[in-house]
A protein has these predicted regions:
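Intrinsically disordered, low-complexity Ser/Thr/Pro/Gly-rich regulatory segments
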Residues: 1-38, 43-193
Length: 193
């Protein structure tokens, strides 16, 4: 995964009020990932309300207030669709759901009060797209939920949300991702969604 993919996800959560931590600064290529290396981002919502409901499986910006804390896996396979066959044949998609990874993730967050006031640790998968045709779409969703994924976000949904929030008269010099999007939007190089 390239830094730009993770940068898009980071910007999306930050633009929606989350504190974001990048779990590691390097990419694992020539060996099997250790537990802590399966997590791409760790997100925390400081404005989460204690009595909030559980977020829907499809996360859009309107659902983010219901997320308290989460680990995020980014699968930026932009030319692929997460079909049932692809999901069954790609166990690396679910690597961040292993017990050793979840144990490591719980160590990264502050302790939840004994009264259970903290929200559950969600497992969020960022993916390019799901099949649009039935029964493949439903089968993909069933596989993702059965594996233990709590929510998914598509790159398309994130990019649309970011583009809607970008002002062309602002200078986003602290974010290469937002600055490039602003420039493209300023010169009408992006189609309206």
């Amino acid at each position: 995964m390239s830094a730009i993919d993770e940068g898009i996800v980071r910007e999306y959560f930050e633009q929606n009020g989350f504190l974001v931590r990048q779990a590691r600064k390097y990419q694992v290529q020539s060996r099997r990932k250790a537990a802590e290396e399966e997590i791409d981002l760790i997100v925390y919502n400081p404005s989460w309300q204690r009595d909030s409901r559980k977020p829907e499986f499809f996360l859009f910006s309107s659902e983010l207030p219901y997320v308290h804390r989460a680990i995020v896996a980014v699968k930026a396979w932009h030319t692929g669709v997460f079909t049932p066959t692809m999901l069954r044949g790609s166990p690396e998609v679910f690597g961040f759901l292993q017990q050793s990874v979840l144990k490591e993730a719980s160590r990264l967050f502050p302790d939840v009060p004994s009264d259970g006031a903290g929200g559950p640790l969600l497992k969020i998968l960022v993916l390019p797209s799901l099949p649009t045709a039935e029964p493949f779409r439903s089968q993909s969703l069933e596989l993702l939920k059965a594996a233990g994924i709590d929510a998914i976000i598509s790159f398309r949904a994130m990019l649309i949300d970011l583009l809607d929030k970008i002002e062309v008269n602002q200078n986003y010099s602290k974010s290469d991702t937002l600055q490039v999007m602003r420039i493209l939007k300023n010169y009408d190089l992006l189609r309206d969604t």
